[in-house]
């Protein structure tokens, strides 16, 4: 098989419907659009128009807003950190912070901080320098002999 022999699978494409080609074709004259009216004209597509009925976007009340000051955190589970320690991606000799987690490949994109969650088990003794930890995660870290440093909010 060569690149020039590639084609669509059988049944993947459908022939174009040729409309307006005489009475005998079955789709002549009005081309399947019926007779007169707004929807028979070209260029009609009224998004949100429901035929004069009050549209849904006006029937429902306005709700909520977007908080531009909201912090967006990278959520990391303890199990994921233990896996990185086991595979040798994470050095436990120095404190673990957002940059160390990024370099280890545990988080992909740097956000406003790191949020530690308690999913999984942690056996390694690690010092964490993160924005937030859940109570259960903090207990597991301290039980393993590690500690958590949470910087104070400015």
Curated annotation (Swiss-Prot):
GO CC, one annotated term: cytosolic large ribosomal subunit
GO molecular function, one term: structural constituent of ribosome
Keywords, in A-Z order: Ribonucleoprotein, Ribosomal protein, RNA-binding, rRNA-binding
Coiled coil: none
Domain of life: Bacteria
One Pfam family cited in the UniProt record for this chain: Ribosomal_L27A
Region annotation (Disordered) ranges: 1-44
InterPro entries in the cross-refs: Ribosomal_uL15 (IPR030878), Ribosomal_uL15/eL18 (IPR021131), Ribosomal_uL15/eL18_sf (IPR036227), Ribosomal_uL15_bac-type (IPR005749)
Compositional bias annotation for Gly residues: 21-35
Gene3D superfamilies, sorted: 3.100.10.10
Keyword Transcription regulation: no
Subunit structure: Part of the 50S ribosomal subunit.
HAMAP family: Ribosomal_uL15 (MF_01341)
Protein name: Large ribosomal subunit protein uL15
Organism, scientific name: Bartonella quintana (strain Toulouse)
């Amino acid at each position: 098989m060569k690149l020039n022999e590639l084609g669509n699978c059988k049944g993947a494409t459908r022939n174009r419907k040729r409309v307006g080609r005489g009475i005998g074709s079955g789709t002549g004259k009005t081309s399947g659009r019926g007779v007169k009216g707004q929807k028979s004209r070209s260029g009609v597509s009224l998004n949100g128009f429901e035929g004069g009925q009050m549209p849904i976007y006006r029937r429902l009340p306005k709700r909520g807003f977007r908080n531009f000051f909201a912090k967006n955190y990278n959520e990391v589970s303890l199990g994921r950190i233990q896996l990185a320690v086991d595979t040798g991606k994470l050095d436990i000799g120095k404190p673990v912070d957002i940059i160390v987690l990024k370099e280890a490949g545990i988080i992909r994109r740097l956000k406003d901080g790191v949020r530690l969650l308690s999913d999984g088990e942690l056996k390694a003794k690690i010092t964490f320098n993160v924005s937030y930890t859940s109570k259960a995660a903090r207990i597991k870290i301290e039980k393993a002999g590690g500690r958590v440093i949470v910087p104070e909010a400015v």
